Amino acid sequence: MSNAYKRVLLKLSGEALMGDDAFGINRATIERMVADIAEVVGLGTQLAVVIGGGNIFRGVAGGAAGMDRATADYMGMLATMMNALALQDAMRHAGIVARVQSALRMDQVVEPYIRPRAIRQLEEGKVVIFAAGTGNPFFTTDTAAALRGSEVGAEVVLKATKVDGVYSADPKKDPSATRYTTISFDEAISRNLQVMDATAFALCRDQKLPIRVFSINKPGALKRIVLGEDEGTLVHV
């Protein structure tokens, strides 16, 4: 079976790295994620990653607690840097060549984000991990995923979550919630579905960049998507 996508952008939430822990990075969880990524890389698909930082610090929560929102968001960007380094290290142990590019300069630790360099690294078969969101406060890492995906020419944004798609309501709170197989960006925005923020949806809609929402906890889901199988929910123009 041939690959459905040549280049994809994988959005990983920081919370997904916690596994069953309450905080931080669960090593077994990150190793399992890397095993899924290795399968996709082995198929020849070029993979970029945007990673969140909510397992360490959330800027929105900091702002709500009375901290200056911009300061809180910069702290959140630094949290994504920690996650990116952990993911890169796990990939190295799995034999995957990965590069971290940061929207905030931290030259002694990672490379700065340079679009042509990122594209070249993807073409060389390296995994490129984008850290520090967009580099600007008030923008989520979901928006960073939409932005970087558009910049590097990804064919789809793969949003890895703890649920297996987009639901009409929170399935944890509403047992009658139903899962969408497909949904348009406009409908997702008008229904205020919280799987991604409206800015990310709008950017992907304008760039005609589809989003597939799937469960990171479902074994083999990432590989099945790359092979073109129907997994999770497709958000489209």
Swiss-Prot record:
GO terms for molecular function: ATP binding; UMP kinase activity. GO terms for cellular component: cytosol. Pathway: Pyrimidine metabolism; CTP biosynthesis via de novo pathway; UDP from UMP (UMPK route): step 1/1. Keywords: ATP-binding, Cytoplasm, Kinase, Nucleotide-binding, Pyrimidine biosynthesis, Transferase. GO terms for biological process: 'de novo' CTP biosynthetic process; UDP biosynthetic process. The keyword Nucleotide-binding applies. It catalyses: UMP + ATP = UDP + ADP. Its EC number is 2.7.4.22. UMP binds at residues 53, 73, 134-141. It is found in: Cytoplasm. Its main location: cytoplasm. Homohexamer. This is Uridylate kinase. It comes from Burkholderia vietnamiensis (strain G4 / LMG 22486) (Burkholderia cepacia (strain R1808)). The gene is pyrH.
